[in-house]
């Protein structure tokens, strides 16, 4: 077992070391620690601890997003495959406002969709997706890999996103969608059954 020092001398000036540091990227720190409540010395010790852990216990953070309306086997398959390729999986669930911006409408309210996804054993953390800016998401969650459906592969939009993420050391992995099932198809079937 490698000992972790209780105290690490803080350099002077502190600003020179923290001007580019946006706070911890390891999920256990980012989720549980309020940076605004830490002193300069505490921030420095947290920084050192994170660098130490990243050296000896590196983790792969995965990220994926979706509406997850009328949760089905296709959603489950994607989350299962994503978790198999990372240590910690963060899932962004689109808000009702974002869904309507895309000229769609979610059957299940956002809060319930988020709770459903949080209950899936492959998911380590659920976050709110309020916009489609993937680089903004990377700045916040510092994921190493993003998982996306392969229907986006090769499009101008995702070619640019891939290039932007590659530039910061992250990659995009495309998964094939489960054939024969989708939230849209399920919703259309329900409308037909109700005679709408």
Please name every model-derived segment.
Residues 1-56:
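Adenosyl-5′-phosphate
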Residues 34-46, 50-196:
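Nucleotidyltransferase catalytic core that binds NTPs
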């Amino acid at each position: 077992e490698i000992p972790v020092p209780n105290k690490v001398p803080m350099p002077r000036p502190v600003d020179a070391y923290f001007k580019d540091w946006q706070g911890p990227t390891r999920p256990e720190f980012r989720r549980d620690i309020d940076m605004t409540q830490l002193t300069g010395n505490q921030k420095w010790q947290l920084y050192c601890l994170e660098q130490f852990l990243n050296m000896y216990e590196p983790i792969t953070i995965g990220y994926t997003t979706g509406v997850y309306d009328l949760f089905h086997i296709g959603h489950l398959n994607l989350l299962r495959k994503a978790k198999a390729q990372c240590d910690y999986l963060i899932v962004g669930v689109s808000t009702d406002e974002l869904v309507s911006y895309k000229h769609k409408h979610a059957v299940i309210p956002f809060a319930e969709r988020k709770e459903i996804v949080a209950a899936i054993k492959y998911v380590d953390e659920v976050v709110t997706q309020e916009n489609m800016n993937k680089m903004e998401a990377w700045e916040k969650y510092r994921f190493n890999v993003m998982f996306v459906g392969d229907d986006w592969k090769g499009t101008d939009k995702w070619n640019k996103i891939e290039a932007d993420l590659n530039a910061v050391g992250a990659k995009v992995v495309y998964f094939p969608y489960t054939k024969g099932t989708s939230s849209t198809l399920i919703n259309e079937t329900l409308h037909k059954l109700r005679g709408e």
